Design a protein with these regions (language model features):
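Surface-exposed loop/turn segments and immediately adjacent short secondary-structure elements
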Residues: 1-125, 131, 135-139, 143
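Short acidic, glycine/proline-rich loop/turn micro-motifs
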Residues: 125-126, 159
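Electropositive, glycine- and tryptophan-enriched low-complexity nucleic-acid-binding patches
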Residues: 141-142, 149-159
Length: 159
């Protein structure tokens, strides 16, 4: 990427300036979806049962292979090669997260990849952005999604 426009329409050509512009753009783009993760005003103290090893195993097996890694660079295939050892380690981490309600900082980071969708590639808004997240983070996200889906199916069966 040779250049991109800043928010005022001026061309940015330095790699560091372009990187900062993309960071600024993605933060603005997703800001409306953010909330304060450290705000525990409405925390429900009656948590669901502990994370189970079988949930971790299922989540790990359901992650698609041959996909790009997130910021940690760990491919899902490594977890699948390590099998039970990976399940035990990820179970321990997921269980700790569940009990403390704290997401590891490294798991909060995503690598954003801009993909041009229009001919004017100097405007950030003319790109789709995809976010690469760590496969370890995907394990916990899949567990949470499955639990929420089960809850929704029970509470709203006809929707």
């Amino acid at each position: 990427m040779n250049s991109i426009k800043d928010r005022n329409g001026l061309d940015l050509t330095e790699a560091e300036d372009i990187k900062k512009r993309w960071q600024e753009y993605t933060e603005e783009l997703y800001k409306k979806h953010l909330h304060d993760p450290d705000s525990h005003d409405d925390v429900i103290t009656n948590l669901e049962p502990d994370i189970l090893e079988c949930e971790v195993r299922w989540a790990l097996e359901s992650i698609t292979t041959n996909k790009a890694s997130g910021g940690d660079g760990i491919p899902v295939e490594l977890f699948q090669i390590l099998k039970d050892n990976a399940v035990k380690v990820l179970h321990s981490v997921c269980q700790q997260m569940w009990k403390t309600q704290q997401w590891p900082q490294d798991w909060k980071r995503s690598v954003f990849i801009p993909i041009p969708k229009k001919s004017n590639v100097k405007e950030c808004s003319n790109y789709h952005t995809i976010a690469l997240i760590s496969h370890a983070s995907k394990v916990m996200l899949k567990i949470l999604q499955a639990r929420l889906q089960q809850y929704m199916n029970h509470e709203l069966p006809d929707v």
